[in-house]
Amino acid sequence: MKRFLRSRFARKESVHDYIGVLVPLEEAHFHSHSARCGKAEFEGRGSDDGNANADLDGDEDEETALGTSYKNSDNEGEGMLQMDAAEYTIEGLRRDVRKGEPGRRWTEYELKSKLINKAIQDIGMGRYNWQLFILCGFGWFADNLWMQGVSLTLPSLSEEFGVTEKQVRYTTSSLYLGLSIGSALWGLGADIMGRRIAFNLTLLITSIFGTLAAYAPNWPTVCFLFGLMGTGVGGNLPVDGALFLEFLPDASSSLLTLLSVWWPVGQLVSSLFAWYFITNWPVDQGWRLFIATIGIVTFIMFIIRFGLFHLFESPKYLLSQGRQSEAVAVVHGIAYRNNKKTWLTEEVLDAVVDTEDTERAPVRVSARSVLKQNLSSFSLSHIQPLFQNRKLGLTTALIWFCWASIGMGYPLFNAFLPQYLSHGGSEVSARESSAPASATPAETYRNYAIISIAGVPGSLLAAYLVDHKSPFLGRKGTLAISTFVSAVFLYLFVTLGTTPAAQLFFTSVEAFCQNIMYGVLYAFTPEIFPAPVRGAATGVASFLNRVTGLIAPLLAANIPGDGSTAPIFLSAALILAAFVGMVLIPIETRGRQRL
């Protein structure tokens, strides 16, 4: 058992474990991703670099300040490593890892990180990456499995413990508090302890406290345990997303959008279990069986991650800890698992950075340095570069506004959807004698399951539309259109949703569009910003999203009236405001290389 745990948490990789994957550097171009795909290499690109740079210099505008100048190409998906054979030399690699910012003194860590990126790009997508896609998808799955799971228990908690419909919404506040804490702590912990530990433990913590909540004797204990469960599930998206991105070749970057398809699947599974258990058991048993079941499902996902899959530690993390030999071994391991070849060695890494313009800062980054660096992401000195020019400042402000608005607007409706469905969704139904004032529990949970099914294709469509060449689509267009339609159907739900059938139609369309919205938003945001400011920009966006999400249940619990319509109107207004912000964003990242 001790040896097994050591292999999962503390195993040190070695290139000697992966014999047969290394090829000489001079043969690397035969094994590149572009060569295997039959794409033409750039011929004589080295001689054209000067002209390309001159063209860029002559057409420089504010977008150049953002770091988003790109070479024109008929094929928008061409990768950064489509080099000719001459560029697979030490000198060629030196030029390639230093391009983009002339005159800059690169650190040893930065150059080696870029070289590892190139090696992973040459290996391309393979068995290991697709397995990781599924296992990281478990994180997205668990996130919505539990967010919707808590929402689905609210009517039962209210009835069993004698809590009013408004008061029981504080249960969601407990969950969001845990999500906020977990998101911050696990994101930071992954930089200090490594991705592998955080990747495995988040689902374990979620399953333990989630299952314990099924045995809670009273409502305060339920809230407390849901909050602890949230500290685990809150780490899934930041940890799993970062891990997947660090193993993802640039040419397959659209898979980051496709990863979001697991999110509505989590909602679907949660709604199906709730429909079965809550409608077929007494009120004090149904929700408990439901919570225990999704707790077991989460534990099974942990077992698959921890027991059946050997996860490589992130090579970027290993490099930051001064463990260069292990970082190289991980790249060899990826090539071995994908049945591909690689040219990366420690000697190549050292030779590429061995120039006078390299800043010889220590490669190893201490835990204290990581902590200081993460905390500095929220300092004014680190945020100030995000407003260094008008276009970048406007982009930053708008994307943060969108994240904050959606962070509050989404839970105001979705976190309490089972409640809205259970009593007609609007005051109109209660006033009109011809319309039913409420739906049966069976109708409520059946409709919720149908709504969940309707949302799944949204993420699949998002992955296609983000790269569509239409001027009205792409990242920005798809995001704005889906957000606008979501807001419209929220308004229609509260004004015309006087019957369960009407509610079902409006909410199904709304769920479909919101899954497109979230799928694009998670991929679009990190693409907007250049690498030097990407961490600060996305970190603040995530923080604002969680904080406003924490406020949403407090508003819903204390808003005047019966709480059936005002929260939905407010949700629609916030989503509509986010749409306005998206339209004003001055950047489209479709077909552009990540900087």
How should these model regions be labeled?
Residues M1-V150, E159:
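Cytosolic juxtamembrane N-terminal segment immediately preceding the first transmembrane helix
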Residues G100-W130, Y336-A415, V428-A442:
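Flexible cytoplasmic loops linking transmembrane helices in multi-pass membrane transporters
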Residues W146, G162, G194, Y215-T221, ...:
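Helix-breaking motifs and short loop linkers at transmembrane-helix boundaries and internal kinks
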Residues S151-I181:
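Extracellular/periplasmic helix-loop-helix junction of adjacent transmembrane segments
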Residues S173-Y176, L188, T211, F226, ...:
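C-terminal transmembrane bundle
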Residues I181-P220:
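Conserved MFS/SLC helix-loop-helix module at the cytosolic interface between two early adjacent transmembrane helices
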Residues S252-M301, S542-A552, P560-G561:
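Glycine-rich segments within core transmembrane alpha-helices of 12-TM secondary carriers
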Residues L259, N280-S366, S571-L595:
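Central mid-sequence intracellular linker of multi-pass
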